[in-house]
Design a protein with these regions (language model features):
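Alpha-helical cap/lid subdomain in secreted, periplasmic
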Residues: 1-161
Length: 161
């Protein structure tokens, strides 16, 4: 599966006033680039913009925190429910890291706190010893953390809040 990344902004050129006369009438304009938010529900970045626009409007006076996902490794849950590790792209040709970078950028754009579990949890299920210690099943489920893995996540969250 996969959702296209998309863009956070579109960009166009607009004439803007930079000078006025004593009556307050604009007398001189220059051309400037201007960005507009993209709220395209068919793209990941558009969805992030739509989500944060809603949350920042509705909860304008609250602390808002977003977290990145963990690193991903192989998981098999039977039938066609097979999750490949992050070294494989999704069907749109993007890797997990691109979505993580988009979440980091969205936190910057929308001025929300970020807990970067991808970077700061220390969980790396691509390696056998890490998978055996911190994930449900070294052979079939390197996607879901076990109790030790959840403790690492909790520690990373507590360091940030």
């Amino acid at each position: 599966s996969g959702v296209a990344l998309g863009e956070f902004f579109t960009e166009h050129t607009e004439n803007v006033p930079v000078n006025s006369n004593e009556k307050g009438e604009f007398t001189y304009y220059v051309s400037r680039k201007k960005r507009e938010f993209v709220f395209d529900e068919n793209t990941f970045k558009g969805r992030l913009n739509k989500f944060f626009a809603f949350v920042k409007d509705k909860y304008y006076d609250k602390r808002i925190i977003i977290a990145t996902p963990l690193h991903r490794a192989y998981a098999y849950f039977g039938g066609d429910n097979i999750q490949q590790n992050e070294l494989y792209s999704n069907r749109t040709g993007e890797y997990l890291e691109s979505y993580v970078e988009a979440i980091r950028k969205a936190a910057d754009i929308w001025s929300v706190e970020l807990i970067d579990l991808y970077r700061e949890s220390g969980l790396f299920p691509l390696l056998d010893k890490s998978a055996a210690k911190y994930f449900n099943n070294e052979k079939t489920d390197r996607l879901h953390p076990n109790a030790d893995g959840h403790e690492r996540i909790a520690d990373a969250v507590l360091r940030r809040i």
